[in-house]
Curated annotation (Swiss-Prot):
Glycan attachment sites: N24, N119, N188, N229
GO molecular function terms noted in the UniProt entry: flavin adenine dinucleotide binding; saccharopine oxidase activity; sarcosine oxidase activity
Signal peptide: 1-18
Record keyword 4Fe-4S present: no
Keywords noted in UniProt: Cytoplasm, FAD, Flavoprotein, Glycoprotein, Nucleus, Oxidoreductase, Secreted, Signal
GO biological process: L-lysine catabolic process
Reaction(s) this enzyme catalyzes, per UniProt: L-saccharopine + O2 + H2O = (S)-2-amino-6-oxohexanoate + L-glutamate + H2O2
Native species: Schizosaccharomyces pombe (strain 972 / ATCC 24843) (Fission yeast)
Protein name, UniProt field: L-saccharopine oxidase
Protein origin, superkingdom: Eukaryota
InterPro entries, per database record: FAD-dep_OxRdtase (IPR006076), FAD/NAD-bd_sf (IPR036188), MTOX (IPR045170)
Protein location: Secreted; Cytoplasm; Nucleus
Keyword Glycoprotein: yes
Length: 433
């Protein structure tokens, strides 16, 4: 009897899993569905770049990241969209964040040796390391930083497309549009159902198509709460993003810059060679979009991505943070317009662990979610671990970290760079110029 899996969502988790299952011939039929073609506008990874770095205070994530980075470097397709530009990270004024970074750096040196990182103990040393970049920058004299010259970024939208093409080559079937837009789970028994268990469900899409499957993987990113009651295990959060367009001459000046990461303010990527855009993202303020649901009393209000018309403006605090960052690090660009602004919606968990587990109320549904803003780097290898969870082979260490929690509430992380969580509907939006 043939076995079928339906993967709902063609972002990082969904595509990586589709490729892994197809390579291993774990299912006879693999169907991946989404409302939009890859890269979907609803995917957090639909962007020009995402950071790829190994620093984690948790050793198991660090090892997972190093494994992924080897694949970024050596995979024939993915290496073409991976850029190892290095990352300059300033030391936070927040003691919890500073402690997190200290532990992460110690872990990396433990695994790779002291040469893995370069410590810069003053603004003078930072300028000496990057003389052309920071010659006019008013850096604080006591500013300290750490450089990882082996970190980098990948073109995230292009990476998703490459994985889709790989999956197609391996025989994965893709369905987009209304026939691929998840609507709900239904109990709709097919002739192949033996026990007719009411907890064995099928997928119904927007146009009424019903997909029967032995196994379903729900990998819908920030939209999970719209389809499934997770009892607040995950929360959709919006992160502000903007860009600066460089001229050809400016591109020559900034093309060799590292990622500059200031956890107290914002961060910036080198200009992408094709578009010559520098991407900026602010830290400190995150946004939720709370809506009422018909879930149980404990989940009456959940956050899902804002579904109204997208705003061409940004929250006021985000612009303030980005401008402060530019004034400090890239003053020659400080008066430039912020363009292509958007909110990048992620699926966040309180402890930053992913949610990769069987959904308790169903017999045949698994979930891969909770990217928490750091999952993209694992695009080359996370599918292997999701597949292991589906097939029952995942290590106990990862099973415990990624389990579906109900009674045991996860511990909130104090090191996160979040000063305030603001409801999207209450945020003050403004135009940059």
């Amino acid at each position: 009897m043939s076995r079928t899996i339906v993967i709902v969502g063609c972002g990082v988790f969904g595509l990586s899993t589709a490729v892994e299952l197809a390579k291993n011939h774990s299912f006879d039929n693999i169907i991946a569905i989404d409302a939009e073609p890859v890269p979907s506008s609803m995917s957090a990874a639909n962007d020009i770049n995402k950071i790829v770095r190994p620093e984690y205070a948790d050793l198991k994530y660090m090892k997972l990241a190093l494994e992924a980075m080897e694949k970024w470097r050596n995979d024939p397709e993915l290496s073409s969209v991976y850029f190892e530009c290095g990352r300059l990270s300033t030391i936070s004024k927040d003691p919890y964040r500073a402690r997190f970074d200290e532990v992460a750096q110690r872990n990396l040196r433990k695994l790779l040796g002291d040469s893995a990182l370069i410590n810069l103990s003053s603004s003078e040393e930072i300028r000496k390391k990057y003389p052309s970049l920071f010659s006019n920058s008013p850096l604080r004299s006591d500013m300290q930083a750490v450089v990882n010259e082996h970190a980098g970024y990948a073109n995230s939208a292009a990476s998703l497309k490459l994985l889709e093409l790989k999956a197609r080559e391996l025989g994965v079937e893709f369905v987009f549009g209304k026939a691929g837009k998840f609507k709900k789970f239904v109990v709709n028994h097919s002739e192949t159902d033996i026990d007719k268990n009411d907890n064995h469900v099928s997928v119904q899409t927007e146009d009424g198509t019903i997909y029967h499957a032995d196994t379903i993987l729900l990998a819908v990113g920030a939209y999970l709460n719209a389809y499934l009651n997770t009892s607040h295990r995950v929360c959709a959060k919006g992160l502000p993003v903007a860009h600066i367009q460089l001229t050809d001459e400016e591109f020559k000046t900034y093309k060799n810059m590292p990622i500059i990461f200031d956890p107290d303010c914002a961060y910036a990527f080198p200009p992408y060679p094709v578009t010559k855009l520098i991407k900026l993202a602010s830290t400190g303020y995150e946004y939720v979009c709370n809506v009422e649901t018909d879930y149980d009393e404990n989940s009456k209000v959940v956050s899902i991505p804002h579904s109204g018309p997208s705003k061409s403006s940004l929250p006021k605090y985000a612009i303030i943070q980005m401008r402060r960052f530019l004034d400090t690090f890239l003053p020659d660009l400080a008066d430039r317009s912020l363009i292509n602004t958007k909110m990048c919606w992620i699926s966040d968990t309180e402890d930053a662990n992913f949610l990769i587990d069987k959904v308790p109320q169903f017999d045949n549904v698994f979930v891969a979610n909770g990217d928490s803003g750091h999952a993209f780097k694992f695009l080359p290898n996370i599918g292997r671990y999701i597949a292991q969870r589906i097939l029952g082979d995942l290590s106990e260490e990862w099973k415990d970290a990624w389990r579906w929690r109900e009674d045991d509430k996860a511990s909130e992380l104090k090191w996160r760079c979040v000063r305030s969580l603001i409801d999207y509907k209450d945020a003050e939006f403004t135009y940059d110029k």
